[in-house]
Curated annotation (Swiss-Prot):
HAMAP family noted in UniProt: Arg_tRNA_synth
Gene: argS
Protein family membership: Belongs to the class-I aminoacyl-tRNA synthetase family.
A single cellular component GO annotation: cytoplasm
Annotated protein name in UniProt: Arginine--tRNA ligase
Catalytic reaction(s) noted: tRNA(Arg) + L-arginine + ATP = L-arginyl-tRNA(Arg) + AMP + diphosphate
Amino acid sequence: MNIYKRLKQDIDVVATSIINKLKSTSDSKKFDSLNDTIPIVLESSKDVNSYDISTNIAMLIAKKMNQNSITLANLFKKKLSHYPYIANITIAGPGFINFVILQEAWTNYLAIILDGSYRKEYSSIGNNKKVNIEYVSANPTGPLHIGHARAAVYGDVLATLLQCTGYQVTREYYVNDTGVQIDNLSKSVYLRYKQAITGQAADIPKGLYPGEYLISVGTNLAEEYGDKLLTLSEPEYLNIIKDVAVNNLLQSIKADLALIGVRHDVFFSEKKLHDSNVISKVIDLLSVKKLVYTGKLSQPKGQSSDNWQPRSQLLFKSTIFGDDQDRPLQKEDGSWSYFASDIAYADNKIKRGFDYVIFILGADHIGYVSRIKAIIQALDSNQDVTLDIKICQLVKLIEDGVAVKMSKRSGSFTTIRDVYETVGKDVIRFFMLTRKNNAVLDFDLVKLQEQSRDNPVFYVQYAYVRAGSILRKAKDNANIAYEIFSTNKSDFSLLSTKEELNLIKILAVWSHMLDGAVKNFEPHRIAIYLQKLAAEFHALWNLKSRDLDYRFIVLNDNNLTAARLALATAVREIIREGLKIIGITCVEVM
């Protein structure tokens, strides 16, 4: 069993007995309903020379039950000190409990890694619960820029992480294929079509899409229709162009996502919601719940009175669910608003029976968080669905030390394809996970082409390659040691140097780290972990240049060599597993 999982279970048993004893001796009735399952958090030590694992459980119980945290910490120490895998327990600060784990417990964990059974520690976390993850969902009005890649990679890796931990996952893309922006797209394409027919450069008015990426769409229309569209009225030619334009750009988006290994199971059309009359039915349902009314909105903050004309309109009572204002359901022309479409789309997700619904939004959509929460609360009366909304912050593309400004509307942006052709899929995917999703990320094209520690994916892949080279050399030059290793007879207790044990401790935290990553929807933890593992392995490798005793292959000591071959194999196994989840290639030679 994983050391962290075992320690957590043992702490839980002791915590439950302590809480129950405190309840039985307390006169206060407020403790009667206290939940026994206070969360147990285990943290790996940042100072491996003093202790291995720490917990603040005593402080949490003390706060909830008005007790002295140091006294409770010492009680934990007394009850846990006799466990055979625990070498020592110390109390620090206001009540942190620090554990030193027996060396044998760490080294024995290598066997669990080598036989692959470590995956069982997290493969059933999800218990087959159904999850819908919606990510990217960029309007099909142009190619995806590098900023879109962040939500794309985050969503794709989160989906893989959930799948490998026992969830049933649907990867979804919501296609906004109707509305004003699609009208503007179609008008822009029409001008490019005229350009192809007449040979005269198109004059693109402000508010439309001037990007040259639409020239090919216009040319294709000219080849298919000739000059026929020039004879039609605007409503007639726009009706033809809309579907062609959306389909062309959606196919382009899918192709760009495929370049960086991102996929979706479902592309859900907003237009179909409008065409099927579903929106009206959902609004009627909310009306029955008395959540819809006709009223007037207050003047938006910052808008001039000269430009504001209050009007009676159909509104959704989103403020009762914590939103900052009620939301309009219809536009001035009587058609349904984007918000009304969002309600119908959310209702569709709920009816598909998902246990979790995850929305991944860009930083420019932070304002949607409160309204999405209001929608789900209004529709999901039984609270059958758990909602989570994740925000992916901006990506600042850096070229030659200067930030590149991007705007799809102006036609000035760096596409995913541009960056892919410069650095490749693996660099894009890994680097998008080097910071938490809600932190701004600087994407430096120059540094990410270097074969150095500044290029994190190279650094991790190189650790995998180095470990593989050790095994190949041993197979050729240390036959006896390789035979001991390959027949699973390695003596792990021989791995006793401080550096070897530090590396093993990092390997042992993999399952614990992954448990936290999936439960918090934070796949960036995997990338951070892999960098730490690679750094520790490279550090151990480099020691041989100063001290030959640190060589992985010690020709006069077959048993030690066999043990170190097992260690190198364990490093490769965990790196392989981590890169597989992130969707990055494991290379054998660099």
